[in-house]
């Protein structure tokens, strides 16, 4: 009798345990696949939907332990081994309250988890010092239970949540590592979250958008080459497709590749820690009408199989499945046949409404469903009632003192003038309202209904902000290259009456002397020397009672000059900046007045001028309108006279460069080539000998002006300016 009772009680305990295990869910399969960048995915399958596990990481030995609450194990093989550089073995064990997976690694690693239906995806990659936690004492994991042993020792290790971004332990570890790292995860709103840790960077990052890329730049923060990495996160089904961390000169760039419609939320958790949340744009559930954009359904999956059932009954079932409060209008009627399997409940509701031309308006967890025309009529009546109330409501007055904008700028924005400042002249002010401006106090005075005043408040909050500033640095280089060569001759003769017993003499120098006799000088001496000869040779030869002198002179010069100017100017966005360097030349101007003439002196500029107007685009580019003029004094012929004039050269252009890029403006180039020849008529034309009766000159001058313009956007909330 006792034996039978014992067997019955044992059977009840076994059945109860089996029922509890079945109701909680069991691990049925484990599969491993590879991703780029040495990343692994462990896909754990369950026989029903489960929750995200908790776990912890140990570095010695390198393991990842995951605990699944109220979960059993239903696998034939509970120890899986792999010949992989990162993952070596997976062991599964369970006790009365939970199941544990222990992932043995060949090197320290880190992980992230994601629940997908009845599967848990575990993403594993090599550990980075920035996000590991060496400051925390290592936790030694309990060994996995053998394959035949279903009950394991109680789990006593501390459990760490895997979704907590930048815990104090992580920050402390990253501070000791002095490195830069990125991490990616997905939240419950289907948003991609990128966490950036940049130790040693104390400023704010520059964020810009280029098409489907978000570019985050950390200025003057150098990234080691070994830390450059790229994450392909397209499988997470978020707006983020790829995350790249790379080095660009002395800067660090984080490039987020996106798809579809999204919005960016930037958060700073601590100095050097930044979180970027890329959210899919919310769909307006309260708007009616046809929307051709693809819809996203996130409700719990259900199965429906009805034939010729009242629509109101289907709505009642959907209300129970979704937990929403659905209120159906009296106009909702009819029957329909419906057969759906594993479809989100919100998609099933959308199909029912489309089939019967219904629409909905949602407020909190209450959904009002009615025919589309009926809801549109209610919306129209509501808006008309609001308009009637606004036309009859009280008027209020509000003063807005502007901080950064000039109140006169709002005159053109609101289309105001002194003759009419009522709502007939602009779109914001109602028919009974008015707007006044006070330039003395830079104040805008608005008199209108509360709703209009609130619109003004929002408009002023958006427009009355500090203008972005641009530091424009110009490098002006003027290079000159000159060459000149001159060759001349001086030819003549002197003589005296020859004395008895004298012989001819030879000597150097034009003034070589001869003694005795009466001197004579040739009247046809050739004098074609170089103006400023570098060298000359004089020859004197006695001929009978005279002498022939010949002086050859030559000059050659080579010049190279370079002038460099480096002016800088700070200007606001879309405001003109001007840099000038040069002279003011006085000119005498004669004017007729009364019966005589009066003379006045006027100053004219002869300058090298640079005028730049920057325009910052929404994606961080800079469009620059550039005007360059180079004026210099010159001599101009006026009849038989030479007067002072100004030579002018100018250049106008518009170009777009990135922030910190350089625009090169050239094309102002001059080259002067000249050859001169002075000779004695007839004698200078004689071949060979004619060179003694000529002076030749050759001159070449080249000048080129190059201007390098580098704009940089200044962070108005950042550090002080540096020149």
From Swiss-Prot:
Disruption of the gene: reported phenotype: Cells show decreased piliation and transformation efficiency. It uses hemoglobin as a heme and iron source in the absence of a hemoglobin receptor and it has elevated sensitivities to various antimicrobial compounds.
Endpoints of the signal sequence: 1-24
Xref: Gene3D superfamilies: 2.60.40.3470, 2.60.40.3500, 3.30.1370.120, 3.30.1370.130
Listed SMART domains: STN
Keywords, alphabetical: Cell outer membrane, Competence, Membrane, Protein transport, Signal, Transport
Pfam family, one: AMIN
Family membership: Belongs to the bacterial secretin family. PilQ subfamily.
Superkingdom per UniProt: Bacteria
Compartment list: Cell outer membrane
Protein name as it appears in the record: Type IV pilus biogenesis and competence protein PilQ
NCBIfam families (UniProt xref): IV_pilus_PilQ
Keyword Cell membrane: no
GO biological process: establishment of competence for transformation; protein secretion
Gene Ontology cellular component annotations, sorted alphabetically: cell outer membrane
Function in brief: Required for type IV pilus biogenesis and competence. Could function as a pore for exit of the pilus but also as a channel for entry of heme and antimicrobial agents and uptake of transforming DNA.
Subunit composition and interactions: Homododecamer. Tetramer of trimer.
